[in-house]
Amino acid sequence: MTAQDFVVKDIGLAAYGRKELDIAETEMPGLMACRKEFSSSQPLRGARISGSLHMTIQTAVLIETLKAIGADIRWSSSNIFSTQDHAAAAIAATGIPVFAVKGETLEEYWTYIDAIFQWPDGHPSNMILDDGADATNYILVGSRAEQNKDILSHPKTEEEEIFFKQIQKRMDATPGFFTRQRAAIKGVSEETTTGVNRLYQLQKEGLLPFPAINVNDSVTKSKFDNKYGCKESLVDGIRRGTDVMIAGKTAIVCGYGDVGKGSAASLSGAGARVKVTEIDPICALQAAMDGYEVVNLDDAASSADIIITTTGNKDVVRLDHMRQVKDMCILGNIGHFDNEIQVAALRNLPWTNIKPQVDMITFPDGKRIILLSEGRLLNLGNATGHPSFVMSASFTNQVLAQIELFTRAEHYTNEVTVLPKNLDEKVARLHLDRLGIKLTVLSEEQAAYIGVTPQGPYKPNHYRY
């Protein structure tokens, strides 16, 4: 790495970041077990990983785990507000190129995505570790643009315009770059629901040119990170952002998937009166039987003190909803992208910045709303994201997925798959001792009776936890 081969806010924060890293390691037993298991065999030797995932302290432990088992790495954040600057500095100080600053512009964000594919020796990456599929999309859209430049001519949003400009800039600087880079990729492991949905859409359209592992739908990711992580980090973000008393307030959670379930529990645990919106009758019934009132936002927006989106969809909270809410209603999103709330429709109104990632927007009638993190992930923009322990489970899945794709690429086709059940159970097993959990062990007779082995796997792939 050259002296300039990183972009962080302040490299002087590295010592502070290292102290927090040391604490996080004690809460991330899965990643530490991976270092112990694979340090000798070095299964990722030769892997050149372009990583795009929130540059937090927990991610720093993931990065150093990948490095410890052989990988070369270049890293950027997957959200303009989610970087913890001391974490980025700690990683950069070790010689790993990282390009991440809290509060990036969109131009900087896409410049940094490009940078994770620009190795000093000029050779391409051969692996992607992604969160939201932006890094994957950058290479795939770029390779299509090298065949047909017209696809860059009609951006639909401001961010897409900036995205297309960065692709064009790289095409001009390095002709053929995207096509060569796409051909070199062995596989991608994807962290989040939104990114997985994008990959499945690419597969459906026949546009996925390499294997992908859906880390999000590992049970030890979606049923833990998405649920229990949000349960702790949502109210943390709201409180840090607003200092508002949550108890007694009416909160509406849009969506009751795993993230919605954790978010509703988070707000309920803080004393809020929680309502839920849903499109899916199964999830709606679950919410009702968990004790929440299931409503339509068109009818219920006027009752809300807090509205949180969790869906991964667009236009969930529209301008007409925001016109109905109470004065000083808090709006926030804990889904991946910023289009769940129609933030663009608010841009022509007066904005008052209260503090970083907290804005007050005033409507013509004088009513005000508080918007957290400009509609992006509030738990990472206004707070520090999920706790280390739950992220250890998610990131252990990422390590195992990278090893699978890099060492066993010939066993995978250009489709989206999930990790095998035995590896999912392994991830859980690695986290039991830290909580003092003692498993019951099946006898041979008991195992035979239910059709499993005493060592597992214990559930069929179709089992819903």
Curated annotation (Swiss-Prot):
The reaction(s) this protein catalyses: S-adenosyl-L-homocysteine + H2O = L-homocysteine + adenosine
Coiled-coil regions, chain positions: none
Chain's role: May play a key role in the regulation of the intracellular concentration of adenosylhomocysteine.
Gene Ontology terms describing biological process: L-homocysteine biosynthetic process; one-carbon metabolic process; S-adenosylmethionine cycle
Identification of the protein by name: Adenosylhomocysteinase
Intracellular or extracellular location(s): Cytoplasm
SUPFAM superfamilies reported in the protein's UniProt record: Formate/glycerate dehydrogenase catalytic domain-like (SSF52283), NAD(P)-binding Rossmann-fold domains (SSF51735)
Enzyme class label: hydrolase
Gene label: ahcY
